[in-house]
C-alpha cells in the first residue's frame, strides 16, 4: 500500500504529533472535540523529510495526494480554488512536532488573483476587505516564498499613508489598497523578474515548498540547536480554509492563554485586534486590546470563547495557548498548544494543577523544562536600589528578570558587543525571528511595539531573558541610533535598566541581587527528589560555591579542582618557587609553605558540606600555566630563588609544550614530581582528621581523585604514594578515618582498559570535557572555529562539549562502567564535566547506570529535575 502523506483534520488526533506536527495534531483533536475549526488537511512531517531526500522536490506520489485533498477540501467547504462564484482561500502554516515560535513562516489568503479579488469585493460588498487580503497575500507570498524582503512593501505602505495623510493601515480605503496591490506586484516583478503567479494551485505548491524549506533556514537551525530538536523530525504543513478577521468592525483576531504565561496565575490572559489578521497580533505592529475587553465588544463570542478555553484546558490538562479569529461575529479556533511560559509560571501552574486534582506529582515534575529553572536563579534588582530609582517609562512586563546594559539597536551589534564582554540591552521597534542571535546575546530586550504575545515576548520567555514590550511612549530613531523617553535622548552605548516583572524602565544601571527561591520551587524539587535515583553533586573549589550548591540541593562535591587554590594571594609565589627548584629538597621546602593553606581550604570545604562526600582532584594543569609572564613578576621570582632572570626565563621556556592538553599534566606530574602528591595527600587527610574530630557525628570519608589515568601501572604508582602517605598521617594522629582513591576517566584508553584500572581505582569519575576532546581529537578552545560549518552542513546537530555525544563518547562510558564493575562490583561512578548539568546528558547518565552527576552550583536544580524526569520516563516505559 502506498504511503499516506496527507491527512484531513477529521482523520487525525492529538497522539499523532510526530506525524502531523503539534499544530496539525491539535487541529485534528479540536475537530474531534466538536470545536469550530476551519477545515483543511495536514501534509506530514515524513513528506518534509522525503522532500529533502528527493533533492528539495515534492515527488509525484505526494503531489497526487495533495491534489486529491484539495478536491476533498473543496467538497467539504463547497468552495473552489480560483472559482468565479465561490472561491476557496486558504492559509498555509508550518507545524513541527515541537513548538518553534517565530521560527517557521505562514502565508494567509492564498488563492487570490486579479479575478478572484474582484469576485470577493463584489460578493461581500466589502471591497476594502478584499483588497486588504490581496495586498497582504502578495506581501507574505513575496517575503516567505520568494524571499523578497518585507521592508520594500512596508516602505510602499508608509509612502501611501504619507500621501493620504493617515497614520494607521486601517485608515487606507479600498482604492488605496487596490493601488498598493498593483504596486506590490510591480515590486515583485522588478525583484524576481517574472509576474506574480495567478494560478491558485501553483501558489499553493510554491507555498508548501517554502514551508518545507523554512525547516532548514538559519533561525530554525539555531532554535533547534538550542532546544535539542533533531533536524530529522521535519515539519508538517497545514492547509486550512481561511477565516477572516479583517472583514470590518465585527471581525477580529487574537491570541490567548488559559493562565498567565508570565506569573502562572489562573486567569484568562490574552489580546485581540478588531479588523485584523492573525499575524498582526503576533508581529506586534499594532498594540492590541486585552481579552477582557472582548466582553464589551462581543459578549456572546466572549462567552463562547471562555467555554472553549475551559474545555481545552480540561482536555489537555495543561495551560493552553490559543489562536482564534472572529469572522463577522462567528468564532473560529485556529490553534491550541501547551503554552510557552516563564520558569516561575511553570512551577506555579504545575503545583496548581496538582492541587486542582488535574495531574499527579510525577506529571508535574515531568512538565517543567529543566533548563528554564536557570532563570529563577538569576538576579533581580536590589529592592533598596530600586526604591531610589525613578521609572522614566513603562511597558508591558513580557518576561521577568532584571536587565542593565548598554543600548544597542540591532541584533548584529548586540552579538558583536556581547562577544567583546560588554553587557548590552537590545532596543527595537519590534523584533523578528532573524534577531534571535542578538536576543540571545542581550541582557534584556525592549520593544516599542507589540504586546504580551509578540515575537519578542514569546522568544524572550522561552530563553529566560528579561523583556519589556509595547513601550509606545518611546520616540524611536533607529537610523540615527537614538530614542527619546521621559524627556531624555538616549544614544547607542548609553546604559539603561528595566524590569521584566513590572515593565518599568530606568535611566542608568541599578544594582541587582541574587535570586530568592522558595514556595513552588521547593515543592517541585521535593517531588523530583522523591523520584530520582541519580545523586547530584557540584563542582566547587571554594566554600562560597559549596555553600550555594548545598542551598540548591547538592549532595556532595563531585569535583574540587585544587589548582584554583594555588592562584590565591601569595600561594602562587610559593608554587612558582616549587616549579623553579632544582632539587627535591627545594621543591619540598616550597610545598611545605603551601601545605597549611591547602589544608585550611579543605577544612572549610568539609565544614560547608557537613559530612557529605567531597571528591578532591589532585593537580591537573601543566606547570606552564602557573609561571609568570610579566617582566616584574619574573624578576621577583628570580630574586626569591637566588637565580638570574635569564635562568628563570630558561626554566619557563623549558615548560613550553606544543600540545599542553595532552602534555605534562594530571598524574604525569605526580609521576615526575611525587612530592606534589605527597603534599596534597597530607593536606586532604589532615583536614579530614581535624573536621572529623570537631564533628564526630559526621560520616566524613574523603575521596581522592587522580586525574588523567591512561594505564593501571601509572595509576598504581601514584596511588601507592597516596596510600603510604595517608596511612602514615592517620596512624600518627591515632585516627580511624577512612578514605577512597579513585581516578578521573578522561582518556579513551582508560575506558578501553577500565577492568585493569578498576583494580586500583575505588571509584571512577568521567571528565567528559577532556574525554570528548580526546575522543573527537579536537580542542574545546579551537572547535568553535569550525563547528558552525559542521552545523550548516548537517554533519553535527549540537556542540559535543555542551551536549554529550552519546554515540561515541557515550559508548566509551558504557564500556568503562561494564568493564570496571566486572573487576570491582561496588565501584561507584560519576560524571563531572559540564555535561553534568545538561538535561539530555543527565538522562543518558541515568540510563547507563551512573551513581551521580556533578555540575556547577547553579545547574544543580536542573540536574535534580532532569534526573527525576529520566526516572519517571523509565517508569512510564515499563
Task: Pin down the residues of each PLM region.
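Nucleotide/phosphate-binding sheet-loop regions of phosphoryl- and nucleotidyl-transfer enzymes
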Residues: 1-389, 422-425, 432-437, 443, ...
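Short beta->alpha connector loops at strand-helix junctions that form conserved
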Residues: 41, 448-450, 469-472, 560, ...
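Conserved alpha/beta-domain cores
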Residues: 93-94, 517, 527-878
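Structural motif
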Residues: 238, 408, 425-427, 446, ...
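Glycine-rich phosphate/ribose-binding loops and adjacent secondary-structure elements
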Residues: 330-332, 429-440, 444-446, 452-458, ...
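C-terminal domain-closing interface element
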Residues: 334-336, 491-539, 545
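Protease-associated
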Residues: 358-442, 504-509, 521, 525-528, ...
Amino acid at each position: 500500500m502506498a504511503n499516506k502523506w496527507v491527512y484531513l483534520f477529521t482523520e487525525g488526533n492529538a497522539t499523532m504529533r510526530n506525524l502531523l506536527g503539534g499544530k496539525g495534531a491539535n487541529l485534528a483533536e479540536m475537530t474531534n472535540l466538536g470545536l469550530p475549526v476551519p477545515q483543511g488537511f495536514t501534509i506530514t512531517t515524513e513528506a518534509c523529510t522525503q522532500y529533502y531526500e528527493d533533492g528539495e522536490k515534492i515527488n509525484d506520489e505526494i503531489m497526487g495526494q495533495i491534489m486529491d485533498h484539495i478536491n476533498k477540501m473543496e467538497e467539504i467547504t463547497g468552495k473552489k480554488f480560483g472559482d468565479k462564484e465561490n472561491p476557496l482561500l486558504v492559509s498555509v502554516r508550518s507545524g513541527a512536532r515541537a513548538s518553534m515560535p517565530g521560527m517557521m513562516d505562514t502565508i494567509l489568503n492564498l488563492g487570490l488573483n486579479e479575478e478572484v479579488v474582484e469576485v470577493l469585493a463584489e460578493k461581500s460588498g466589502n471591497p476594502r476587505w478584499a483588497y486588504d487580503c490581496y495586498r497582504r497575500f502578495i506581501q507574505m507570498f513575496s517575503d516567505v516564498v520568494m524571499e523578497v524582503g518585507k521592508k520594500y512593501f512596508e516602505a510602499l505602505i508608509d509612502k501611501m499613508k504619507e500621501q493620504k495623510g493617515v497614520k494607521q493601515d486601517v485608515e487606507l480605503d479600498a482604492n488605496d489598497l487596490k493601488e498598493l496591490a498593483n504596486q506590490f506586484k510591480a515590486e515583485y516583478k522588478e525583484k524576481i523578474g517574472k509576474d506574480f503567479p495567478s494560478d491558485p494551485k501553483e501558489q499553493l505548491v510554491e507555498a508548501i515548498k517554502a514551508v518545507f524549506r523554512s525547516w532548514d533556514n538559519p533561525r530554525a537551525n539555531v532554535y533547534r540547536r538550542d532546544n535539542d530538536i533533531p533536524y530529522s523530525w521535519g515539519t508538517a504543513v497545514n492547509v486550512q480554509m481561511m477565516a477572516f478577521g479583517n472583514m470590518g468592525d465585527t471581525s477580529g483576531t487574537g491570541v490567548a492563554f488559559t493562565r498567565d504565561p508570565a506569573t502562572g496565575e489562573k486567569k484568562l490572559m490574552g489580546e485581540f485586534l478588531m479588523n485584523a489578521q492573525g499575524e498582526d497580533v503576533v508581529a506586534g505592529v499594532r498594540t492590541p486590546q486585552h481579552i477582557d475587553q472582548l466582553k464589551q465588544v462581543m459578549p456572546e463570542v466572549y462567552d463562547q470563547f471562555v467555554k472553549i478555553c475551559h474545555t481545552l484546558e480540561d482536555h489537555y490538562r495543561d495551560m493552553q495557548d490559543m489562536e482564534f479569529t472572529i469572522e463577522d461575529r462567528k468564532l473560529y479556533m485556529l490553534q491550541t498548544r501547551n503554552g510557552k511560559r516563564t520558569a516561575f509560571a511553570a512551577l506555579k501552574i504545575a503545583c496548581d494543577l496538582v492541587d486542582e486534582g488535574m495531574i499527579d506529582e510525577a506529571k508535574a515534575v515531568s512538565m517543567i523544562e529543566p533548563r528554564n529553572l536557570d532563570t529563577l536563579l538569576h538576579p533581580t534588582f536590589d529592592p533598596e536600589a530600586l526604591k531610589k530609582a525613578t521609572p522614566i517609562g513603562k511597558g508591558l512586563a513580557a518576561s521577568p528578570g532584571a536587565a542593565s546594559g548598554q543600548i544597542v539597536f540591532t541584533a548584529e551589534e548586540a552579538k558583536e558587543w556581547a562577544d567583546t564582554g560588554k553587557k548590552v540591552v537590545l532596543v527595537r521597534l519590534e523584533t523578528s525571528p532573524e534577531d534571535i542571535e542578538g536576543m540571545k546575546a542581550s541582557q534584556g530586550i525592549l520593544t516599542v511595539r507589540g504586546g504580551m504575545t509578540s515575537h519578542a515576548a514569546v522568544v524572550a520567555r522561552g530563553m529566560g531573558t528579561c523583556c519589556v514590550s509595547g513601550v509606545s511612549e518611546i520616540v524611536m530613531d533607529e537610523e540615527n541610533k537614538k530614542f527619546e523617553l521621559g524627556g531624555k535622548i538616549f544614544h547607542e552605548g548609553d546604559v539603561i535598566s528595566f524590569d521584566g516583572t513590572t515593565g518599568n524602565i530606568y535611566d542608568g544601571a541599578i544594582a541587582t541581587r541574587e535570586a530568592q527561591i522558595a514556595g513552588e520551587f521547593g515543592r517541585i524539587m521535593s517531588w523530583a527528589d522523591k523520584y530520582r535515583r541519580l545523586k547530584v553533586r557540584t563542582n566547587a573549589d571554594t566554600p562560597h560555591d559549596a555553600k550555594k550548591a548545598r542551598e540548591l540541593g547538592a549532595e556532595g562535591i563531585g569535583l574540587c579542582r585544587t589548582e584554583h587554590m594555588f592562584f590565591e594571594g601569595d600561594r602562587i609565589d610559593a608554587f612558582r618557587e616549587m616549579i623553579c627548584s632544582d632539587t627535591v629538597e627545594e621543591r619540598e621546602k616550597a610545598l611545605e609553605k603551601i601545605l597549611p593553606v591547602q589544608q585550611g581550604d579543605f577544612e572549610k570545604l568539609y565544614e560547608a558540606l557537613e559530612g557529605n562526600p567531597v571528591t578532591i582532584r589532585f593537580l591537573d594543569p601543566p606547570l606552564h600555566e602557573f609561571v609568570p609572564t610579566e617582566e616584574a613578576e619574573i624578576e621577583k621570582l628570580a630574586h626569591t630563588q637566588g637565580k638570574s632572570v635569564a635562568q628563570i626565563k630558561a626554566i619557563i621556556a623549558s615548560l613550553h609544550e606544543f600540545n599542553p592538553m595532552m602534555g605534562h599534566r594530571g598524574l604525569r606530574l605526580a609521576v615526575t614530581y611525587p612530592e606534589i602528591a605527597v603534599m596534597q595527600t597530607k593536606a586532604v587527610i589532615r583536614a579530614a582528621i581535624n573536621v572529623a574530630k570537631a564533628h564526630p557525628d559526621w560520616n566524613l570519608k574523603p575521596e581522592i581523585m587522580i586525574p588523567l589515568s591512561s594505564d593501571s601501572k601509572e595509576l598504581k604508582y601514584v596511588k601507592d604514594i597516596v596510600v603510604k602517605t595517608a596511612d602514615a598521617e592517620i596512624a600518627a594522629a591515632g585516627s580511624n578515618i577512612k578514605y577512597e582513591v579513585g581516578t578521573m576517566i578522561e582518556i579513551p584508553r582508560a575506558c578501553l582498559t577500565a577492568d585493569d584500572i578498576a583494580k586500583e581505582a575505588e571509584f571512577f569519575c568521567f571528565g567528559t570535557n577532556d574525554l570528548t576532546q580526546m575522543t573527537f581529537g579536537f580542542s574545546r578552545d579551537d572547535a568553535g572555529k569550525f563547528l558552525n560549518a559542521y552545523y550548516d552542513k548537517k554533519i553535527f546537530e549540537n556542540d559535543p562539549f555542551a551536549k554529550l555525544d552519546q554515540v561515541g563518547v557515550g559508548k566509551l562510558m558504557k564500556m568503562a562502567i561494564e568493564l570496571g564493575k566486572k573487576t570491582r562490583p561496588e565501584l561507584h561512578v560519576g560524571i563531572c564535566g559540564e555535561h553534568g548539568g545538561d538535561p539530555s546528558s543527565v538522562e543518558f547518565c541515568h540510563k547507563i547506570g551512573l551513581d551521580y552527576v556533578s555540575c556547577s552550583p547553579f545547574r544543580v536544580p536542573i540536574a535534580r529535575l532532569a534526573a527525576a524526569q529520566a526516572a519517571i520516563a523509565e517508569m512510564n516505559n515499563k
